[in-house]
């Protein structure tokens, strides 16, 4: 990671790198972001190339002063120096990139661990509560979010009154269908992929797969093309895109099925962690759904936990609507690295 000496010197570079886009910003002062840039991952052969493009576009006065410290969150496990991204053909050595870019400090962590760091800093106007009561301040918090994949992390309290962000790969747990219809969709996915993880169905590609399975396996949902892009399914379901193929009902049902499946996975995570501090949903899909998510089967499925239905019914679920929460989390993660001496 390099030296932590004078790591509070600003500006500090933060970057949230997902499977589709890379979002960069400069932290000019504690938790104050500027020069936010969103770069399409497909436009760059490597993470370093994307970072160089962002740095090259900074105002001359900032470029002249230089950026010495950086923290990057990536949609991938971070298990050592060598990193190969799961949803993009980028691979790099953290130390080699630090040296190549001339940083004194270069922190790399899982993107959902970075987002977990942000949870204590999100304002009430950046969170939409979907059911439950009030959160318990010093209890574990669960985090998940469907986008290109399905990110999962947690924020756990310590005896010192702080929180520790824990990265995980919970998106790759085996998907468990909850009714006969979901069994049919699961079988459709299993024939194609073998192992059916939660991410196979609860992600952008998962929404596409659900839509495809509905048309392929159920007479009721024959209208429309065999396959559609996730963005189009969502837009048609929300009435934002013209329904020229007559499959609005199929798109809406695909979204509702997706939300119900997410409710199952979110509840499993909540009871595993004892997440009385709340369950937080980020990613690119759910915040986009707006009221359609609140009115979906999500909460009903979330509370469908048999003997533990009362336990999860009290747990609040929050949809994150902050514009760049991962970047705020990276600022906090950099501070945490300084405090812990790592």
UniProtKB/Swiss-Prot annotation:
Q: Which reaction does it catalyse?
A: D-glucose + ATP = D-glucose 6-phosphate + ADP + H(+)
Question: What protein name applies here?
Answer: Glucokinase
Tell me the superkingdom of the source: Bacteria
GO molecular function per UniProt: ATP binding; D-glucose binding; glucokinase activity
Pfam families reported in the protein's UniProt record:
Glucokinase (PF02685)
Q: What is its EC number?
A: 2.7.1.2
Chief localization: cytoplasm
Q: Where in the cell is it found?
A: Cytoplasm
Origin species, per record, is Ralstonia nicotianae (strain ATCC BAA-1114 / GMI1000) (Ralstonia solanacearum)
Q: Which gene encodes it?
A: glk
Q: Where is the signal peptide?
A: none
Among SUPFAM superfamilies, the record links this protein to:
Actin-like ATPase domain
Residues bound to ATP are: 15-20
What biological-process terms (Gene Ontology) are attached? glycolytic process
Q: List the disulfide bonds.
A: none
GO CC term (a single one):
cytosol
Q: Which family does it belong to?
A: Belongs to the bacterial glucokinase family.
Record keywords: ATP-binding, Cytoplasm, Glycolysis, Kinase, Nucleotide-binding, Plasmid, Transferase
